[in-house]
A protein has these predicted regions:
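N-terminal single-pass transmembrane signal-anchor helix
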Residues: 1-31
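Acidic/proline-rich low-complexity IDRs
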Residues: 7-9, 69, 100, 124, ...
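Compositionally biased, intrinsically disordered low-complexity segments
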Residues: 22, 47-50, 86, 109
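Membrane-proximal N-terminal amphipathic helix
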Residues: 35-62
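Extracellular/periplasmic head regions of type IV pilus-like filament subunits
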Residues: 56-112
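Low-complexity, S/T/G/P-rich flexible repeat/linker segments used as non-globular hinges
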Residues: 109-131
């Protein structure tokens, strides 16, 4: 009686391991994107809350209005004027803030007249982040 595996048994094991690895790889990448979306949703909620906090602080000293900028004076870190350490994965251009997730991106616009921080809900990434 021979001890060991036949070539056919080894091929089956390799094929099964390949299938399992491909399924696991897809799940890992999807989980990573879900985590980044969750962090961005948290950032957006913090930013909106920070805008309201600045508005309330302005009211306490007799100035009625939303902050004119979401950054501290002279700072290049997005949102450090409304949340403590700013936010990662965001870039700023004027009053527009871009969040990138892989090859997709969405632009949020801050309107200091009414304190809104929002994006175009026709984009799927915007809906994933705000709804």
């Amino acid at each position: 009686m021979r001890r060991g595996f036949t070539m056919l048994e080894l091929v089956f094991v390799i094929v099964i391991l390949g299938i399992l690895a491909s399924v696991a790889g897809v799940k890992i990448f999807a989980t990573r994107d879900d985590a980044l979306i969750s962090r961005a949703r948290s950032d957006i909620a913090s930013i909106r809350g920070g805008i309201i906090n600045k508005y309330n602080a302005n009211m306490m000293v007799g100035r009625f209005g939303y902050p004119s900028s979401l950054e501290k004076s002279g700072s290049s870190v997005p949102f450090d004027g409304v949340i403590q350490n700013g936010a990662k994965d965001w870039t700023k251009s004027g009053n527009d803030y871009t969040f990138k997730l892989g090859s997709r991106s969405v632009v949020f616009t801050y309107d200091s007249a009414n304190g809104t921080f929002d994006c175009s809900h026709s984009q799927s990434l915007c809906r994933a982040l705000t709804e």
